[in-house]
Amino acid sequence: GLSGSGKSTIAVELEKMLNEAGKAVYLLDGDNIRCGINSDLGFSDEDRNENIRRIGEIAALFRDAGIITLVSFISPFREMRRVARERAGEGNFVEVYVNTDLQTCMERDPKGLYKKQIKNFTGKDSGYEEPLVPELIADTKKYTAKECAEQIFDYIMM
């Protein structure tokens, strides 16, 4: 989903639920990765692809260690999501589309990103390719973050 759609909020709720269920879990979020390992990347299509590629590699390392990895990022291109799914391996990737319209995201704008003049910002002047067949769709206009997290929790625990 777009910036402000609720991805991070849902992921934090889901992380709590998984921890309470005794699962080893780690949350990779756009904020902590963009400020660290991917701080050298901008927002060009090439940099966005590299951002998601690196995240996919990191998530695979966590998976190899037996840790459930929650990945909360703007992933604007279907092809990169396909590559990340492939890298994760069969049965190890659940795509959740946090479907929130642009206007709502702009109204929420918790980080003030829509107000900034960021070149190639997803949803503003750079496109977002909606998933064609995600495993789950989280509608944050209709449901709370906790309700969305519960839906995801139920799906991955079945």
Where are each of the predicted segments found?
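P-loop (Walker A) phosphate-binding loop of NTP-binding proteins
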Residues: 2
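Conserved substrate/cofactor phosphate-moiety recognition/catalytic segment
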Residues: 5-60, 64
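ATP-dependent NMP and nucleoside kinases share a basic, alpha-helical "lid"
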Residues: 24, 36-42, 59-116, 120-121
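Conserved beta-strand scaffold positions in the cores of enzyme catalytic domains, especially
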Residues: 27, 93-95, 135-137
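Helical mechanochemical/support elements of P-loop NTPase systems and associated helical scaffolds
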Residues: 47, 51-54, 80, 144-148
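Small-molecule kinase domains that catalyze NTP-dependent phosphoryl transfer to phosphate-bearing small molecules
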Residues: 99-151, 158
